[in-house]
């Protein structure tokens, strides 16, 4: 087992930009070839990234310095230098990044996959081609690359837990942790058995659980560095509540309690403001009268302290006298419920914080329109009457695809978050199911990448408790390389990932992925998920004219398709507005030609989806609210809105006219076509 190291310091330096090239075109019969020097590549970044599989800095403790690679210099024939490779420092959940020189906090990393760029690489220099002008057609100079950022950082990990077990050495904290959770800390009858913090999860039922942290024993003077306390006191800063574990065999249990609280107060006054519980352990070693007397003594001490220091208490702590080794039945239930109750306010606040408003543009202006997480049903080309669930704020995605109808968003993400509460979504879904019949699928789609929703598995589970309608996840597949993500999606009935390219260059051109997403890793995730998933697996291939529709590009895609072996391949193209004018649709003839090429080269069902007959049976009358909830996720034309709701274009035009007049919707000309979008 790696040694638990919770503080490390490093010198950090990003890569320097590569120099631009001074070069001139030299070819036979081209005497005035002109400058053709390429630009230098940008230097690599230094990135700190959370990895849930790591619990300390043990693997990097001996490092003194991290430096990213420099960008390569430009070359002749307008060839740009390669970007320098990034350096990624993998850290545990709960890592705080400090500027070592100023002690300022640079980042607080709380979620698996979350990243922070501590030093950015220098920009590459311009080649001499860049400096050519009408008066100087042969510049003999180029730009040097810029230096990368450089600084000293300190990393500290602070464990994230709901309950922190606090006590003197050898009071039974580790035994209590082991009894309440599946943690397996070292347990023995001598002081300082626990030399590192231990974590365990206590499950009350499917929905309710909490994390317990066992902190090494605290002795008097710990806040000043005595014993092991100072080293690990930081780990209870993030806990929601504290449990003071006190040995009933101590001569003066009230004095022990006072000493523990005093050490916490000396370290940080915020610690003693936390809710608390008191567990008096080792009742099996005393007579009933002794136990009763000591419980009364500590009750008296608690009441006195609470009376004199109300501003530092939420409320008087509950007190439990027990023996950890015989903890079961009613007493076990009482203790676990007390632990959970101590954090209820924290859980409620978390839910409130995660109910973020829908965001519709890059500057994150709040929408004044009320939008729902459940929308439709809409007529889907692939899924018939589809009731949509949108768990992601506008344009929150791991890709910035050039064909996205929502517009461009360079701030891509890979970290997961709970943007909306599961209860809120389930409430809306129940209401929608009462008002809509003949639903073919409940589909996760809409404003962004649904796998960025942290509680996706739980939400799918809750949906399956209220309906037998199959659940579909439409995903770009970018996060399927993560084992935990593949596990979360196993409960779905149908998963439709996308594959827009068969090689790295085209992948970057079309999907413009977050820099954490590697093409080969993404493809391997698609293959591995197919291996373990027992439901229906359809693969979407998005074809764009003059980008990925050539024989060579199709061959690259087909090669990967044959490795994945999906149940079906669906070929689609840009039938709606796009965020980039380069994203051009194939016509019907070209799509049919591509379909036949796929069919000739892979033994998988190939489909070019159109509106299904079953979907055309939808007779729900469209409302202004339906249009708003549709356009906020998918700006579109009158024709496509009418198709999506199986509605007359005249009816759609009439409603859109009212919405435009009210200022809720605006008209836009995109790529020469009139479309409609929601106003902020």
Swiss-Prot record:
Subunit structure: Monomer.
Disulfide pairings: none
Organism, as annotated: Brachyspira hyodysenteriae (strain ATCC 49526 / WA1)
MF annotations from Gene Ontology: 4 iron, 4 sulfur cluster binding; GTP binding; GTPase activity; magnesium ion binding
Enzyme Commission number(s): 3.6.5.-
Keywords of the record: 4Fe-4S, Cytoplasm, GTP-binding, Hydrolase, Iron, Iron-sulfur, Magnesium, Metal-binding, Nucleotide-binding, S-adenosyl-L-methionine
Boundaries of every Radical SAM core domain copy: 383-613
Cofactors demanded by this protein: Mg(2+); [4Fe-4S] cluster
GO BP term, pick one: ribosome biogenesis
Function: An essential GTPase which binds GTP, GDP and possibly (p)ppGpp with moderate affinity, with high nucleotide exchange rates and a fairly low GTP hydrolysis rate. Plays a role in control of the cell cycle, stress response, ribosome biogenesis and in those bacteria that undergo differentiation, in morphogenesis control.
Database matches in Pfam families: GTP1_OBG (PF01018), MMR_HSR1 (PF01926), Radical_SAM (PF04055)
Protein name: GTPase Obg
Gene: obg
Region (Radical SAM domain): 371-680
InterPro entries: Aldolase_TIM, G_OBG, GTP-bd, GTP-bd_Obg/CgtA, GTP1-OBG_CS, GTP1_OBG_dom, GTP1_OBG_dom_sf, GTPase_Obg
Annotated positions binding GTP: 167-174, 192-196, 214-217, 281-284, 317-319
Top EC category: hydrolase
SUPFAM superfamilies membership: Obg GTP-binding protein N-terminal domain, P-loop containing nucleoside triphosphate hydrolases, Radical SAM enzymes
Binding sites annotated in the UniProt record for Mg(2+): 174, 194
Keyword Ion transport found: no
Principal location listed in the UniProt entry: cytoplasm
Single GO cellular component term: cytoplasm
Domain of life: Bacteria
Domain called OBG-type G: residue spans: 161-336
